[in-house]
Structures are given as structure tokens and as C-alpha cells.
Amino acid sequence: MINPVEDLRYAFRGLRKSPMFTIVALLSLGLGIGANTAIFSLMDQALLRSLPVKHPEQLVLFSANGPRRGQVNTSYGDIYTFSYPMYRDFRDGNRVFSGLLARFPISFSMSWHDQTERVYGDLVSGNYFDVLGVHAAIGRTFTPEEDRRPGANPLVILSYGYWKRRFGGDPGVLNQTITLNAHPMTIVGIAQPGFNGVGVGEAPEVFVPMMMRSQMSPDMNDLEDQRSMWLNIFGRLKPGVSREQGEAAMNTFWKPILEAEAKDLNFSQRIRERFEKRHLSLLPGGKGISSASAQISSAIVVLMGMVGLLLLIACANVANLLIARASARQREISIRLAMGASRFRLIRQLLVESLVLALGGGLLGLLVAEWTGEALLKFLPSDPSMMGISSQPDGRVLLFALVLSVMTGVMFGIVPALQATKTDLASTLKDQASGVVGGGLGHLRLRKSLVVTQVALSLMLLIGAGLFARSLYNLKNIDAGFHTDHLISFAVQPSLNGYSQERMRSLFERLRENIGRLPGIRTASMSEVGLLSGDNESTSIEIEGYQAKEDEDMNVFQDKIGPGFFATLGIPLLAGRDFTNADGPKAPLTIIVNERFARHFFGDQNPIGRRIHFRREKDSLEIVGVVRDGKIVELREKPLRCVYLPYAQSQVQYMTFYARTTQEPSVMTQTLREEVRRQDPNLPIFNVKTMEDQIDESLFMDRLVAALSASFGALATLLAAVGLYGVMAYMVVRRTREIGIRMALGADRRQVLRLVMKEVVAVAVVGIGIAVLASLAMGRLIQSQLLDVSARDPWVMAAATLTLAVVALLAGFLPALRATRVDPLTALRYE
């Protein structure tokens, strides 16, 4: 009869009697399970978790491939952005959705009781909460009627977390007024707990009606602009309508809309045909939209593979320990079998012991996962795209840890249990009586196989660590196209405080001039788009005298900059001139392009003096200069086609300032903050960082993968060394009499050392060979994560192999040295 309580007592009693075994096994499992749990938690939050909304499987995300016209907000990639008129047409004319919503992430300057802070939030359509099926914890949500007239409903809904954090969870804030971007807004509700919008990893603090767009973003009157692509659109399919059916219906509906837009925008026949070829796709939307998913998804999958290998190594290590433990208990097991105990009964007891170990390792693993999660958060950038990532395990993560622990217990416990109970009773009792260590050659072969597995997996992790470290080194030393040393930056967004365009230009110019005169500052300038920040503002253009090719992409990156920008950044001017203070609002419109732009559109011709049109501007802009290519959005990018405009001739909402210092740039932080406060004490300053810090932040995923792979590789190597040491020590004990006989017959210590080390080398060589072949075969899986280094790089493989070989030889040397000290008389005592 099965008695689980008795099995548990037996397991705990046995583990208490072997404290060293228990501690080593728990540590091995805790590290392996903890690492897997931590990476799974990150993967779950970034890639797997469904939105906490009603029936998330019914949600779809709108995307459209093909040429676009006008300005595109590409925080999430330009295929996911649409104009408000497009959204309105989709919402009012479709027959396959029960509702369509639109949203746009935005930052706000929030004032409450004379305290001002910068908060993140979403502009949302009036039906946003209804379509998602999200309710208010207190108060109410927006209504579709509040989505009709621009500026008519100055309302705001707070997220539950922000309400708790900023207002102490006081229900009395309902119907109170806060100030957002210099506009009084009435709090009408608190969103339900756990709802953080539809942006993966984000944590919007406030939700504002879409019709408040112009009030929240002065000078952005794009609610009627067909060419301003800025909205994400989600739809909820009607019951019984599949995603494919919805997509087909929407493309049929969209075609006349595209034709009408092309006609309104006065496209040429060729461009109109290209524009009308665009295809609308409905993607699964139940997991939300992520601005960082493309960047982190592949890296997280690689990390998950690495921690999987680490767990296999830990399992092999514990299995080795269990086999050694079973060898020491062979006499006990044989006697119990001889007295009538069934083999199934003993296997069950041994498996219960393994499961107790695994669950204990799982509990320890939760602590390791939380510590690892806290360390992971330090790598993440401090921007809205990652604000919602948490290190705290939720129910899904706890369930994952439990299931993984049980599976691990069975995985490392079943083979040792079968091996331990498969024994020849007579020979085992005879060997034990004569002092021979139990287990036989079968145990030794199995343990060697496990160590070979550990060596192979450890080397694979070491090779991966070397490749990612080399790739990170290449990224950090890549030519960015500008000088990164002694450069500090910060950003301001006066539009959030109600500044007009004229007032903003005046502020920007005063800041640029005053900062440039500060002690310790050599030169200063500014740009609207922060370098290497991941932001990408693009627009479509037409060039006078240039005939675009069929399906040619005419979108280019654009930035609005101040005088001296290229000199401050150290970007060489290749032709023409730089902008000056004379390039003001009333001066002729000018533009500077980079060499990639000039080479693509003009070839060997001189671009200076050529003219460009973009957006709806009737006036053309004259190219007055050409600058060298550089990294703009991220370090991995190929050179973009870039155009630069004088900020004084453009509409701007915010500005990033750059200062080239004569001393360590970080010491200038307080000085820069004080200068901004002198201009406006209520103007928030953010993203104050050196360019080195900006680069590190932009490489957060590369740094994370490199650091974790190095840690996993080192840990795996340690576990492999422990396993190899244990096997060789066991082998030496089993062959004590053989070694004694050899020494009695004249073998010296060097020969004995060579005998044992030959076994070490054999195990290491087999494991290394398997690892090298596997790494060569699987290298293509991580090649996309590497920069300027092949996944089959011979130098990395050689360095990793040498490292593991040295560790293996050191691990085997200690048992070999012990073998040379065997006393032949003692070894032969039982012969």
C-alpha cells in the first residue's frame, strides 16, 4: 500500500544524514531553476502575457505595409501607425468589429498642489475602455460621446498604480482638478487594478481623451490630417468573425479610402498606384503592442535557451551526486531487496527524495529569481517602454517554477533510481563485505556520460558567452560618426507647460547660448531627436528633378537642429555650409542632408542648391550642406537617409541639448539643471546623461545578454568541474587495489598520475568535441544577435575550449594526485 507520508519521512531522514550532499544539490538546483524562472518572468512580461482585458483573443492590431505619405511616428514601427481620419473611417464604416479603439503614448507635465512632475500616459479614443472591457475601480471611464468635439472634455483617468503611489489611494481625488500641460483636467475615474494600457512593458499613469490632442500637444493639429501617421489602432472582432475574414473585409473597405486619400493629396499617377497597393493586415492583438519587442524577443529566446542548458547541467550534476549516493547506499538497497522489498517501492522512495530535493531547489530558485530579476532591471533603460517590467513573481511565474521543479526532480531522479535498484544481490553483498565500493562499472560509465554532457553543455555556454562579449565589444567600439567623449545631454519639453512656438524658440536659443558660455563647456547645441535614443521621426519627400523609381521608398529620417550642432557633435561637414543664426523663421527655407541621402538621390552630382518638398509644405527647401553619415537611432543600424532642418524654421515640441565639456561631463549635471531653472523654475528637465551612458542604455539588451551569458558560462563550468572531480574521485576509490598492485609491481607516481589523467583527458575531449560540433551546427540561431563576429569564430571557440580544458585538468588533477599517494600495502590488504 502506498504511504506518501512514510516516503516523505524516509526522504527527509536520508537528506538530513547527508548534509553536504543536500546543500550541494539544493544550490545546484536553486541556481538552475532560479535562472530559468527569472528569464521566464522577463519573457512572460515582454512576449507571452495577454492583456488583462475581456476576451483578449478577440483583439487584433492594425498594421499596413507599403509606401506611406507624410510624417510618421515610428515609436512602434511605421507599419503600426495610422492617421486619425483613417481610424475614424475604419471605426464608422466597418461591419466586422464590435468596436475599434485608438491610442497614442504621450508625456505630460502634471501639477497638483504646487508640485510639478513629468508623467507618462495615453491619449485614447472615447470607446477605449469599453472596447477593451476594462472597468473603473472607482468613478467611471470615458464615453464615445466624449470623442466628438476637440477640446470639449478636459477629463483624465488615473491608473490604479499611479493613484496609489501619487495620491495615496485617496478616493477623494475623484472630481478633483489637476493640471496637465497647463490645462485644468478633472479626474473622473481610476482604472481597474492591474491594467497598464495596451503597450507591452509600459505603465501609463494617466489616460486622456483623444479629442484633447491639441490642448495636450500645442501646434499638433493632426486630428484632421490624413498624412500624419501617429495612432495605433486595435479592434475587437465580432463573435464568429475570424481574423482572416476581418482582414479581407477591411481591405475591401479600405481600397476606396486609399483612392480618395490619394486623390485629395494630389498624387501623381505613378505614386497613386503605389499608394493604393498598400495592404492592411490584422495581427493578433491580445498581447498588446511593443516598441521593444523586435529588439528583445530574439535576445530573450537566446537567454531562455542558455538557462535551459544551465538547468540540464545542474540536473546532470545532481544526477551524478545521486548515483554516488546510491553507490554508498548499495548495501542498504541490496539488503532491502533481499528481504522482499519490491523494486517499484524502492524506485518510488528514491523519486520522492529527488522530488523533495527539486522542490527545495525550486523554493531556493524563487529567491535566486527575485535577486536575478532585480539585477535584470538595472540593465533596462529608464524610459516608458520598460516602466511596467517587474521583478516580482506573479501566479504564472510561480506555476512555472513549480512545474519546472517537478519536471526537474523526475528528470535527474529517474535514471539514478533505476540504476540503484538494478543490482546483483550476491555480488553486491560480497563486494561490500570485502570493502569494494558499490556501483560497479555501470555506475561509473553512467557518471562519465553525465560528466561528458556537462562538459559539452558548459563549453557551448562558454562559446556563447565569448561571442556575445565580442559582439558587445564591437558595438561599444563602433564608429558612431560623432565624438562620444566629453559629451553630456539633457532634454526639455516646454510645450507641456503651455509654451507657444515663438516662446519655445526664444527659450531654446537662450539655453543654447547660455550653456555654451558656462565654465567647463566648450560648445553647445541641440536637436529635436535624441541621438541613439531609439526615436525615429520620418517623413516622405519629393525632390525637384528626381524621378522616383517604381516602389522606391521616399521616406527619410528628419531632425530639427540648432546652429553648431554638427560642430558640437564632431560630425564633419563634407560640402556646403552649416546652419547659422541667420537661418531663422523669415529666412529662405534650408536643409542639410547626409552623404547617404546625397549618394542615393544624386549619385556623383552636386546636391548643393537642389530643392526638396515634404509633407504639405508648398514651399521647397534648398540643400545648403552635406554632412558625414552617423548612427542616429541605434548603433546597429545601417546609415539612414537623413535630412536636417533649422529648428527656427520648424514646428518643435521638445529639444535635446548637447554640451561638449572640457572636464568629466557628469560633474556638469547640476550646473545644467541650475541653468534651466534660471530660465524657468517650473520646466522639468529629463534624460540628463553622458553620451557614454546613453550608449550603454541603448545597448541594454546586448549588455544584459553578455553579462548573463558570462555568468551562466562561469556557473556551468564550475558545475562541470565539480562533476568531473566527483567522477574521478569515485574512479580512484574504485581502482584503489588496482593502483596498489601497479605500485607494488614498480609503477612510480608519475605513471599513476598519467593513468588517471588519461581518463580526465578522455572525458574532456569527448565533451569538447560534442560541444564544438553542436556549436558549429547551431551558430546560425544566434548570428542575428551578433555584430561583426561570426557565430563560428575560431578565436572565440579556441579561447573557450582552452578555458574549459584547463578547468577540467585542474578538476581531475586533485583525484589523480590522491591516487599517487595510495599505500600499496593498505590497498592489497583484502587480497
Regions found by a protein language model. Name each.
Residues S18-A46, S50, I313-C315, A358-G362, ...:
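Short, strongly hydrophobic transmembrane alpha-helices
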Residues G121-P144, N153-S298, E374-K378, G464, ...:
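Mid-to-C-terminal secondary-structure elements
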Residues A314-A358, V436-V437, V722-A764, I768, ...:
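Interfacial "coupling" helices/loops that link adjacent transmembrane helices in transporter permeases
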Residues M1-F21, V53, Q115-T116, R149-G151, ...:
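Membrane-helix entry/capping segments
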Residues L51-S107, M229-N232, D264, L475, ...:
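Membrane-proximal extracellular/periplasmic loop immediately following the first transmembrane helix
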Residues L31-N65, T372-P381, L457-H486, A729, ...:
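Alpha-helical transmembrane segments
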Residues M1-T22, G288-A292, L321-R348, V352, ...:
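Alpha-helical transmembrane segments of integral membrane proteins
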Residues I39, A319, L355-T428, R470, ...:
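Small-residue-rich transmembrane alpha-helices
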